[in-house]
Regions:
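Aromatic- and carboxylate-enriched substrate-binding clefts and catalytic-loop regions
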Residues: 375-565
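C-terminal beta-strand-rich structural cap/linker in extracellular carbohydrate-active enzymes
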Residues: 683-710
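Catalytic domains of carbohydrate-active enzymes, especially glycoside hydrolases
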Residues: 356-377, 444-448
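Bacterial Sec-dependent N-terminal signal peptides
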Residues: 1-21
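Carbohydrate-binding surface patches
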Residues: 617-655, 702-705
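Catalytic cores of secreted or luminal carbohydrate-active enzymes
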Residues: 567-614
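An acidic-aromatic substrate-binding cleft motif
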Residues: 266-359, 367, 371
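N-terminal accessory beta-strand-rich subdomains and adjacent acidic, glycine-rich linkers
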Residues: 21-302
């Protein structure tokens, strides 16, 4: 169903000193725009009468360019403006995502587009505001015009003036990685806590003592939840935020390229949306579709080949350190196309062997999993990292002990597919050189999804993971994959901004610390009750949950441990939404706890409806989801190191139906550090209106399945 209503009102007017307003459909969110001083564009935002963003400046700064006709005195797009036109409109539709947390999404907003003109030189930009019941988006637009055709953005100066010294859940600003632990502090404390927030990880490099990444979640002292992010980041660098901590004003901070410039533009063009989500209920932050709604509709006519995936794989044992991606220890350096692996002595630790992959295929087939990821199948892993090497992989040639043809045939005979792995070692140029042949190889053997990786320093050298060049590369990989009906799960790529609506074969991203960090010292217990408020605002995460043997030293030489209980791992299949979900542990570990593994067998990966029952950033999240095309529900609850008691009223169940309810929860003595594998399974019948009360241990959680009784 689609309902569209448009009402346009164009007003020619002189320079305004009074504010122009646009309100959300329900009137709760009010955005006011005005020009101040010497034609400086500003805006402010309120929610239910409370200030959210105080008067904040808008504008951009260009780089002088003789070729583009931009003189040094013409680089200012921050003042000297007059309002030349204002248009307001309303829009309402219901659209259906290819996959998602719900089967339909309401897109309802009021809009105001303000045309701003500078007389000398004569040029116009448009600032467009879209205001929703749960927030707003704004962007800059550059119409086709003679005095602003080609131009280079030196800096973007979009401000977000906070109304107080809010509590924030933040990551240090970084051009190349989001793999930090979240810091919780007042905004005024960011500067003092920045140094401790950075580890000696060589991939972590901050740009400012008060610079942070988006999505940034905050909470005001009077109970407002506020989130700053961006939507539809296309052909533009990723935005960070730099804080003036004397005045509590954030300003946009764009990722530079190798020359220090930010974005190369050709009109007509738009920037990404700068987004604000706001509510006095934390649950609204998690259920918001504002980011998705600000993206363009799906660009594909046929999406029948795009399917959510539940998978296992040859991965965790390498992450823990018990097996390796590389095939041999004989070659300190590899030259693709020259080095002969057929005569090399195997190191005995290689994970991606034909025999091992068959074992995982058998496990997947037995337990109803769709695919098996295999990392380390292709030549080149012996010297893949740290050398700024251009030609690292060819994405086509398997190691001698990996029979790509036989394994795919074996998998297909079992009703399972293999999931391809393309680690690029951040050599994007090399990947693009081989991409077409790599995708053709996948088509030849029946792969329909690929996990890509970008570990290391970017090639082209000097570029950053989150600059305009690489953002274009990531999207190019997705759109080229679509031509081959391939789904993409990109790791180490830029953080998502809702592009999965437009390109739904972008089925997963990493872009944060995932489960792998549990083998590198561990994630804090509150990690997975923060990420849904921050990282997941832009799109789903391939978090790779499901670790049952949480004490790694019990089965490997790794001394780290997973900072959740076993039941808490089950919760992640609901709390950490993704249409791509991994059963990440080893098959033999699941066999030891087959009764608990039943929840992973049963849980869906695509949904008709989702209900966030209770939530507080960094403390707890409880969510219920209805499996796509069924009457069955699943509930997940996760908490931090303090534990939690979830109270769940089953008022979302269908009237008149009885449900077989299975509760997988922490045992009374469970504790993520002292007794992580203590869990309880309770079965009973429930109906609409019943109440479940479930105790969550420190670092714990639970999963609940609700099947309609037949």
């Amino acid at each position: 169903m689609k309902i569209i209503s448009l009402c346009l009102c164009a007003l020619m007017m002189p320079l305004l000193l009074v504010a122009q307003q646009v309100k959300s459909p329900n009137g709760n969110v009010v955005v006011s725009f005005s020009l101040v001083d010497n034609g400086v564009p500003t805006y402010k935002v309120s929610y239910k009468g409370k200030p959210v963003i105080k008067q904040s400046r808008l504008g951009l700064e260009l780089t002088p360019s003789q070729n583009d006709g931009i003189k040094a005195e013409d680089t200012n797009l921050m003042n000297g403006f007059k309002v030349s036109n204002t248009e307001t409109s309303s829009f309402k539709e219901v659209w259906k995502p290819v996959w998602g947390e719900t089967s339909s999404i309401l897109n309802h907003y009021n809009e105001m587009a303000v045309s701003l003109t500078q007389e000398h030189p004569n040029r116009t930009i448009i600032v467009r505001f879209r205001v929703y019941n749960d927030g707003m988006g704004l962007r800059y637009e550059f119409p086709r015009q003679s005095n602003l055709g080609y131009f280079i953005i030196k800096d973007e100066h979009t401000q977000f003036a906070m109304a107080g010294d809010h509590t924030a859940w933040w990551l240090p600003g970084d051009y190349d990685t989001q793999e930090y632990e979240t810091v919780t502090s007042k905004l005024s404390e960011i500067r003092s806590k920045m140094k401790a927030a950075v580890t000696d990880n060589t991939s972590q490099t901050t740009f400012s003592e008060t610079g942070v990444q988006t999505s940034l979640q905050m909470k005001s002292s009077d109970g407002l939840y506020i989130n700053l992010h961006e939507a539809a980041c296309v052909n533009y660098p990723t935005m960070h935020l730099n804080l003036d901590d004397k005045n509590m004003v954030f300003e946009s901070w764009l990722t530079p390229d190798a020359q220090g410039n930010k974005a190369y533009m050709q009109a007509p063009r738009t920037t990404p949306w700068r987004t604000l989500i706001v509510s006095d209920d934390a649950r609204d932050m998690l259920s918001s579709n504002l980011i998705l709604n600000l993206n363009e509709p799906c660009q594909y006519d046929d999406t029948s080949w795009i399917k959510p995936v539940k998978y296992c794989g040859v991965w965790w044992e390498m992450i823990v350190g018990r097996k390796s991606w590389s095939y041999t220890d004989e070659f300190p350096a590899v030259e693709i196309g020259v080095t002969d692996f057929s005569k090399a002595k195997p190191n005995g630790r290689h994970g991606a062997t034909t025999a091992e992959v068959k074992r995982y295929i058998d496990f997947a087939a037995k337990n109803g999993l769709d695919q098996v990821l295999v990392e380390g199948w292709n030549i080149g892993w012996e010297d893949w990292f740290g050398h700024s090497k251009f030609k690292v992989f060819d994405f086509q040639t398997p190691y001698p002990d990996f029979d790509i043809k036989a394994l795919n045939e074996y998998a297909h005979s079992k009703g399972v597919k293999l999931l391809m792995h393309h680690e690029t070692s951040a050599s994007a140029m090399n990947y693009e050189r081989y991409m077409e042949d790599a995708y053709k190889l996948m088509n030849k053997y029946g792969y329909n999804s690929v996990k890509s990786g970008y570990v290391g320093n970017i090639i082209p050298r000097g570029e950053h993971h989150y600059g305009q060049v690489m953002n274009n590369h990531y999207l190019y990989a997705v759109t080229e994959a679509a031509k081959h009906k391939i789904m993409v799960n990109a790791h180490e790529a830029t953080r998502p901004t809702g592009l999965c609506r437009t390109y739904p074969n972008l089925i997963g991203n990493e872009s944060a610390r995932g489960t792998e960090y549990e083998a590198f010292g561990g994630n804090n217990p509150d990690h997975t009750v923060i990420l849904p408020f921050t990282r997941l605002q832009g799109g789903p995460m391939d978090y790779t949950p499901g670790i049952f043997e949480t004490q790694l030293k019990n089965w490997s030489s790794n001394q780290s441990y997973v900072h959740t209980t076993l039941a808490g791992q089950l919760a992640l299949y609901l709390v950490m939404y993704s249409p791509l979900q991994m059963a990440a542990d080893l098959p033999e570990h699941y066999e030891k706890y087959s009764d608990a593994f039943q929840f992973i067998r049963d849980v869906a990966v695509d949904w008709d409806d989702s209900k966030y029952i209770e939530a507080e950033p960094g403390d707890y999240i409880t969510v219920a989801r209805k499996a796509k095309g069924t009457d069955n529900w699943f509930i997940g609850g996760k908490c931090d190191e303090n534990g939690h008691k979830a109270v769940i009223k089953l008022d979302f169940l269908d009237k008149g139906k009885t449900y077989e309810c299975t509760i997988y929860s922490d045992a009374a003595d469970a504790d993520y550090e002292k007794n992580p594998k203590a869990y309880s399974i309770i079965r009973k019948q429930v109906k609409r209106g019943d109440v479940l009360k479930i105790n969550e241990a420190r670092g714990g959680g639970f999963g609940v399945s609700l099947f309609v009784k037949k």
